[in-house]
Amino acid sequence: MSGVDRSSQDEPVPFGSLFFHVRRGWGAPVWVRGLLLAMVAGCTTVGPDFKSPTLTRGVSVLPDSPAQGTVAGADDQHFVAGQTGSQDWWKTYRCAELDRLVQIALDQNPTVEAARATLVQAGENATAIQDNLTLPTVDAQLAQTRQRFSTAAFGLPGGQAYLFNLTNASVNVSYPLDVFGGNRRQVEALQAQHEMQAHLWQAARETLIANVVTTVVREASLRAQLDATNALLQAQGELLDLTRQRQGMGALSLNEVAEPQAELAQSRANREALALQLDQIRHQLAAYLGQYPAQNPLPEFHLEDLHLPQFLPQAVPSALLRQRPDIRASEAQWHQATANLGVTIAGAYPNLTLTGSMGAMALSPGALFSPASSVWSFGAGVVQPIFHGGALSAAKRAAEAAVQSAAAQYRNTVVQAFRSVADVLRALTHDAATLEAERSIMEARQQSLGLADQQYQLGGISYPALLAARVQDAQARMGIAQAQGTRLADTAAFYLALGGEVDPAAVAQATSGSPSSSSGQSAPSEAR
């Protein structure tokens, strides 16, 4: 055995894996120290920097969409330039019971609760990995072992054996030097994933709100249609009774009785279908509230309880990109794929890790605190991938394909978002025209019914003729109930298509498990 400290000699160092340990001084070769200092001083971040996409100048939702003005028809709706979607847009219906149910749904709906839990999970995972990659790892170790040692292990003659106890207490420190930014890119990808989950949670909230509103609107419309159907059944029933009386007196044939009888049967079938839809709507509303169908009594809604929102925000293309949570989530997914490409690229560069430990080693626990028992070490390791059988190149190509896929998915999300806004804008225009036409029909039927009633009182027409006017009036009321419900529901669809407004307080509360901003990492949506 030589008494020379081998760590102080310049020995050949493998290029692929370099390790050195220091005792009582920095004994590394000069060129190694220079290389490490240059690598640390020249820290960079490899891979492409993500930049939030923007729309091409001149892009509009519809070629002839009104920038501001009025959707023609009864109960005009105005598109107001410069107005954005309200955080509480459902309150524009001015229905206190609807507001209460929306709040219950946001608090108790399992889907929204699951989305929030997934968001918190993503935030906590990002925080854990971020701290592990950017901060030193410190561990305490205490070991008590009993060993049998032979001098033959060192080539000494005789092979004398020793049996002893060994106590070891130490503190170990490890710190990865992120020279080429692989760790920073990994943290960036995790933050982008957390941002994506935040937007998915927001999308779940907005979808739930729209579903509650449209369900309430459908209930109110169905109740109005049921009321009109009941009035229709009453008039058709009386008309059938009179027809049968006249047939019994020989004034009418059996064929003339069959027609009103079939109409009455059809109306009864329609009433049962409407009643079934109403029951199913009530069950669906309870499910949105996170309740069982018969758990709690729900309020009844009528069209008179709901008011049509008159002032709607203008659909601005640039605002769509920032307001719709599905677009923001797709952008964050694109950002994550870009950051993962940087992680893959950094994997082909050298990886430097600093390690150190300090402690004591003695033959008995009582001797741990003696000066002679102290031990320490400091080391650094550099690993440079050289040949991995083409795995690194394949991984890079796969990461580049993932970026292209995420970019294409983002473009598709934007296109579909613009399509949905265009659809609902057209729907609002046609809904207003349809409602105006149904009201014209209603006014004409009511005028006809009033004249028929006057003529009947004067003996100018028969009672069957009066009943026929009542039947037409009931049918007109059914049409206007459907038109009112459709317009109210499409208005909710319009707010959903705009994406609503993100509530900063709600997002801050839900993202309580997000990565700490003190780490020095910039926001996921910012350009790197």
Residues of each region from the PLM?
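Sec-dependent N-terminal signal peptides of Gram-negative exported proteins
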Residues: 19-23, 28-43
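Small/polar-residue-enriched beta-strand and adjacent coil segments characteristic
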Residues: 48-53, 87-88, 94-104, 108, ...
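Repeat-solenoid scaffold signature
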Residues: 248-277, 479, 486
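Amphipathic alpha-helical coiled-coil segments
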Residues: 115-129, 204, 208-231, 235-245, ...
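Terminal intrinsically disordered/low-complexity segments used for targeting and assembly
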Residues: 2-3, 10, 34-107, 155, ...
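Short proline/glycine-enriched turn/loop segments at secondary-structure junctions
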Residues: 295, 368-371, 482
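N-terminal secretory signal peptides that target proteins for export/translocation
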Residues: 1-27
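Charged, alpha-helical scaffolding/interaction elements associated with membrane systems
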Residues: 108-109, 249, 458
